[in-house]
UniProtKB/Swiss-Prot annotation:
Necessary for signaling by class 3 semaphorins and subsequent remodeling of the cytoskeleton. Plays a role in axon guidance, neuronal growth cone collapse and cell migration. One of its GO terms (molecular function) is hydrolase activity, acting on carbon-nitrogen (but not peptide) bonds, in cyclic amides. It comes from Homo sapiens. The gene is DPYSL4. The keyword Cell membrane does not apply. InterPro entries: Amidohydro-rel, Hydantoinase/dihydroPyrase, Metal-dep_hydrolase_composite, Metal_Hydrolase, Metallo-dep_Hydrolases_sf. This is Dihydropyrimidinase-related protein 4.
Length: 572
């Protein structure tokens, strides 16, 4: 089935390339070999390859050849108060390619009154005409309605979508109740898709926002104060509980705190099928900047859940990422200019949420995890590319350097260093939340769909060249365990005879507006237990008694001291 839709942008001829002398790095092995690329695919891998004449040769000696990065979380068209982000599909995907990412997964967020299917079509139209690299789509469920099952089924079967996100925050806008989550998770499980959650306790956040605003706290620091770490951790634990009961695989987006990450790690150790996604911001900086005297700088950090002010959080998250307790990395890239952020200059709750990270993600993970010795080059490939491709079911088309895979490749220089700055980034915003951070490791050449997109610091991109990548359901990486548990977890009642004894009659409380309380129906004869009447006791102080026939003395004198006799020589 084709999911390409109505896209009519002409395909651009791919380059014919020979990458020589590089060290190929996949998630499970590394080796030296040459790579022949043609028609947008990897044609050959090996030594002394026979290739056509006139082919472009790229010298990769001393460098690594990696599968292109996959950014699992972007919001390049997220509508906020009638505004759209500064980095749209064109600028955002250009920045992605500059950083070594060759595929993104963007979130469809339906406007009020717009169906999931209609919103999906809107996103496809925007991305097809502007994206510079390949992309796919998650769909956010922003409200519950009776026909949601039919919409989800259509998106899965007809549109190539296999992941849906629900919100536990943003009360009165898109927050789901626990019962709604359980029902949605059950539908998603039956469809073979993946349930995602934005995990925060929206009720507490709203109350904290009101309290802080009443105290006169209106600046960006109010945002982090109204989103304490505990509301994220509690929501993660609750989401894990609901997903486990529904036997639905769970994917937690934007893991920002130690508590949330630990809740995921502990759930995995209990056997829950759950995946956690730290983002560039939570791995590369901290939330101390919310208290900056520069309002615009502080506002640039506003996102939900917030960047944690604890400076040890990033180290904790990179440790869990290196150990496998967290599996993927995203950017949650959603940027707004200072003028757009200033909509909330007098009320932190109105500041558009979102940070940058799409361009910096690959280098930041290398700096924090590989250069620091926490993970090796293969694990780096896993958390920046391969695991995402496996979880969302487009592996090995993406996420692997192998014959037949898409020619989305990054020639990586582990010795390169760069200092992140708003003066040099490929974004349309004035502030970069990683300003001044020095990173070791950077892309030297980026190849997208078999075409060179970055070389010698120069970009070669074409808006609209990006293709939509459809995803099938029931990915093995996720659903093998779910299927096994479905077979093993069948529930059977205990075989027993029908109870036919007495049943006590009770009053069932009436529902509001239904009139008088109803009497519970009882199938058997009612047996009323006896009640003792104290006024009808058989005991009497007058008349004949049962022991009147026993002879009694009129009196008996007892010779004993007060308290009775005692014998100090005997303890018996």
């Amino acid at each position: 089935m084709s999911f390409q839709g109505k896209k009519s942008i002409p395909r651009i001829t791919s380059d014919r390339l020979l990458i020589r002398g590089g060290r190929i790095v996949n998630d499970d092995q590394s080796f030296y070999a040459d790579v022949h690329v043609e028609d947008g695919l990897i044609k050959q891998i090996g030594e002394n390859l026979i290739v056509p004449g006139g082919i472009k040769t790229i010298d990769a000696h001393g460098l690594m050849v990696l599968p292109g990065g996959v950014d699992v979380h972007t919001r390049l068209q997220m509508p906020v108060l009638g505004m759209t982000p500064a980095d749209d599909f064109c600028q955002g995907t250009k920045a992605a390619l500059a950083g070594g990412t060759t595929m993104i997964l963007d979130h469809v967020f339906p406007d009020t009154g717009v169906s999931l299917l209609a919103a999906y079509e809107q996103w496809r139209e925007r991305a097809d005409s502007a994206a510079c690299c390949d992309y796919s789509l998650h769909v956010d469920i922003t409200r519950w309605h009776e026909s949601i099952k039919e919409e989800l089924e259509a998106l899965v079967k007809e549109k190539g979508v296999n992941s849906f996100l629900v919100f536990m925050a943003y009360k009165d806008r898109c927050q789901c109740s626990d019962s709604q989550m359980y029902e949605i998770f059950s539908i998603i499980r039956d469809l073979g898709a993946l349930a995602q959650v934005h995990a925060e306790n929206g009720d507490i956040v709203e109350e904290e926002q009101k309290r802080l605003l009443e105290l006169g706290i209106t600046g960006p620091e109010g945002h982090v104060l109204s989103h304490p770490e505990e509301v994220e951790a509690e929501a993660v634990y609750r989401a894990v509980t609901i997903a486990k009961q529904a036997n639905c695989p769970l994917y937690v987006t934007k893991v920002m705190s130690k508590g949330a990450a630990d809740a995921i790690a502990q759930a995995k150790r209990r056997g829950v099928v759950v995946f956690g996604e730290p983002i560039t911001a939570s791995l590369g900086t901290d939330g101390s900047h919310y208290w900056s005297k520069n309002w615009a700088k502080a506002a640039a950090f506003v996102t939900s859940p917030p960047v944690n002010p604890d400076p040890t959080t990033a180290d904790h998250l990179t440790c869990l990422l290196s150990s496998g307790d967290l599996q993927v990395t995203g950017s949650a890239h959603c940027t707004f200019t200072t003028a757009q952020k200033a909509v909330g200059k007098d009320n932190f709750a109105l500041i558009p949420e979102g940070t940058n990270g799409i361009e910096e993600r690959m280098s930041m993970v290398w700096e924090k995890c590989v250069a620091s010795g926490k993970m090796d080059e293969n694990e780096f490939v896993a958390v920046t590319s391969t695991n995402a491709a496996k979880i969302f079911n487009f592996y090995p088309r993406k996420g692997r350097v192998a014959v037949g895979s898409d020619a989305d490749l990054v020639i990586w220089n582990p010795k390169a260093t760069k200092i992140i700055s708003a003066k040099t980034h490929n974004l349309n915003v004035e502030y970069n939340i990683f300003e001044g951070v020095e990173c070791r490791g950077a892309p030297a050449v980026v190849i997208s769909q078999g075409r060179v997109a970055l070389e010698d610091g120069k970009m070669f991109v074409t808006p609209g060249a990006g293709r939509f990548v459809p995803r099938k359901t029931f990915p093995d990486f996720v659903y093998k365990r779910i299927k096994a548990r479905n077979r093993l977890a069948e529930i059977h009642g205990v075989p027993r005879g029908l109870y036919d004894g007495p049943v006590h009659e009770v009053m069932v409380p009436a529902k509001p507006g239904s009139g008088a309380p109803a009497r519970a129906s009882c199938p058997g004869k009612i047996s009323v237990p006896p009640v003792r009447n104290l006024h009808q006791s058989g005991f009497s102080l007058s008349g004949s008694q049962a022991d009147d026939h026993i002879a009694r003395r009129t009196a008996q004198k007892i010779m004993a001291p007060p308290g009775g006799r005692s014998n100090i020589t005997s303890l018996s």
